[in-house]
Structure formats: C-alpha cells, structure tokens
Amino acid sequence: ILVVSHDVVGDAMAGPGLRYLALARTLAAHVAVTFAIPNPPVARLSAEGFPVVAYRRNDWPTLEPLARASDAILLNTDLATDFPALADLPAALILDAYDPMLSEGRAMVAAHPRDQQIGWWRERMNNLRAQWRMGDFYLCASERQRDWCLGQLESAGRINPLTIAEDPALRGLVDV
C-alpha cells in the first residue's frame, strides 16, 4: 500500500503529518507500506522499517511510479484533486476524509468579499464532487463525520439501490 501524506512529515509535524505517519506505521505491521511525503525525508524516518520517499504536490511524475507499483493507495481527499490520474489506475483508492475542508475553508474566507467566498465555494464543491466519485473506500474520524460523508457520497451518486443491496450499512464504502 502507498500511504501519501499531504503535509510535512519530519522532526516537527502538525496534525496531518502525525496522522499519516501513524497510519503508515499501523499498516506496516500488516502489509508492505511505502510512505510518500511532500518534503525530503529526515534521517530518523529511515528507522521506520518501510520506504519513505518524497513527492511534489501537483506534480504527477513524482508520484506516478509509486502509485503504479501499488495495489492500494491511501491519501487525503484533497490529494485526489491534485492527482486526478489516480482514478485511472487499477489500485484501490482509499480516501481519508477526516479533515472537513469545506467547513474549515468557509471559516477561512468568511472575511473576504462575498463574490470571492462564492467563487471559493464553487471551486471547493467541484473538487468535492470529483473526490466523492473517485474513491473505492473512505475513512473518516467519527460516526458523526461518517453521516456527513454518507450524504456527500449519496449526492455524488455513489449510494444507490445497488450499493445498499450489497452493503446495507455501507461500511464497505465509508468507515471510522
């Protein structure tokens, strides 16, 4: 599995970097992991027991060889927007929706003029629609967030009579 962090992983990390390092460590106890990070690996990461490699956001050639060599790819939903070609690969695409950027982003642009807020919102909604259509499985942080994800997936056409007949609880599509 290829685990892709969208945030710096190193000697000083914020929440996302910590989360993806923890996910890579947990998965490495069960499957072969390659960990892709958006910064040069620091020395201490060599002791993790799995390859740690750098890639650049919005630069497909830096991620493509790793993605093509993987059976599954775990990444943040926004990276799916950065790398839409992931949807064309045979690898299972696991999107991590733990960070509800729509809500956070609305707060970040609240002081901007209304037309800028609307422009940001439209772009964000277009990105979200693509993200909810391209994943094979979605992770989230809580049951409440899972409810939000289910609504997003339904509006993207991912939940329908066929998916409900196969998996009435939809845990095979989105889970905590």
What do the PLM-derived regions correspond to, one by one?
Residues 42-65:
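Conserved nucleotide-sugar phosphate-binding/catalytic loop shared by glycosyltransferases and other
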Residues 67-68, 87, 132:
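A short, aliphatic-rich alpha-helical micro-motif
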Residues 126-172:
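A short, active-site helix/loop in glycosyltransferases that binds the activated sugar's phosphate group
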Residues 64-82, 91-94, 137-139:
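Short N-terminal targeting/anchoring amphipathic segment
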Residues 1-42:
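N-terminal subdomain of nucleotide-sugar transferases
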